[in-house]
């Protein structure tokens, strides 16, 4: 189930053996994945935002909250905290290696997140209710659009669009994810 209808990026180079690349593509296709070809740097930028940053955030949130709890405060931790920090349960050694291998792209993703948090902090400091509501509304809207896109028909269409764009070399990343339009 993990790889069924998942997007799998294969990052071959000019020096890659075509037969080997074909075997790798066949492997992922056999697992039910939709294989696309991307340059390594593009792949690294995408996974830094979509996979690595969430893992970093889960660990940072766990460290920031659990590392500062006083006796009895853990009783206040609910399902939101549980769900948000689930990714921190991953192998620390594996995530150390991933972070070391993709440090530059992860740093950029963190910079972008810090800019968002700075905007939020400024709005909180100024008690700007409208800015705060817009911040949370945007987060809600982006998530709803993403969830809606997970439905099979639209997901398959987006995968087809992403594949076509990647093959044309026309893959643009926007601040909040991939431009699917």
Language-model features: where?
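Rossmann-fold dinucleotide-binding core
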Residues: 1-35, 44-47
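Charged, alpha-helix-enriched surfaces in structured cytosolic catalytic cores
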Residues: 19, 41, 79
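Short, structured loop/turn "capping" segments at alpha-beta junctions
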Residues: 33-39, 57
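An alpha-helix initiation/capping motif
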Residues: 40-47, 51, 133-137
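Substrate/ligand-engaging "lid" and interaction regions
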Residues: 46-84
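Interdomain hinge/lid region at the active-site interface
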Residues: 72-143
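NAD(P)-dependent dehydrogenase/reductase Rossmann-like domain
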Residues: 117-181
